[in-house]
């Protein structure tokens, strides 16, 4: 079960982190080994064991342990259950009182493989060697958190307006500039929401300076202070993530005197990751929000009321890479097994696309609006770090075994490279 805790003070940034950030680099570098039913039942602690096609991605030497032909196919289901609950704000008020659970189930194929074994007929030295091809899942991206509740203290679109004001004061634009598409080129992707929000009416110019903004869910009282409605706003946050990371492995193994087992992998990685997230705010009582629009030509004023607003962010990332891996298993004493493997860094060739949209609804539909923008595909390289696997196991004849594994990877070695083309 995946448990997600969300604080709505920061939720407007939902999904807005670029796929070229450290969090994404870590996500795409980590391995959540899957494999066959046998290896998963052992928690994939197979570095020192081998003998199963699900273990080849962990230690290539494992293919030489099983002195027979093998074919495996492992279907599965991937379950995701997300639970969300709000936290108490500094003033003692809880905006999201109830727990919300949301689940998602997907079919998966953790392992598919074949291995051929060739006996040399010798009693010592190279007694047999193997050749195999294995497909192993190393990550499943599957989550769908959902959070909702009533908030009288903070507004996501108020925060969007505050961000627009900060950018305007830093000289990136004035309100008039936000109608020019070139403004997107000046901003980071996570700030595109400011442009779509302004064009849709989710935020608006406040005053005449062109550098002050107000959110659709806010109003200015008689003293000039910006406030939320007395009855607050209903907020909803949702996110759906899907995708996978799969290794396609060509393997060769060798058994030396039933004591030393060697193996080597040439691996290709295929990655797909898609995320769609949104935050929506609705007025509990639209009469709390008197929104005044002023006609720039006539000076006439029109009063309408805020109904709802929604901001969405989507990202789609794909990648392909290659790596090499070498492994060894040694059986120095009957029952004792020691294994180790080392994998080269993986150079991933990545492509990412992002989309942002904003919607604003007023009770006078003439003032409602929608705006969306999608980025061109960006191409770059991601180098994931080298990793090493160590394992030790003890077998009790045909009665059972104990196995322990340790994987070492220096994630500070994650690097991005710009595409020269």
Features from the language model and the residues they span:
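Hydrophobic alpha-helical membrane-insertion segments
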Residues: 11-12, 68, 407, 414
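Outer-membrane beta-barrel porins/channels
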Residues: 20-34, 39, 117-421
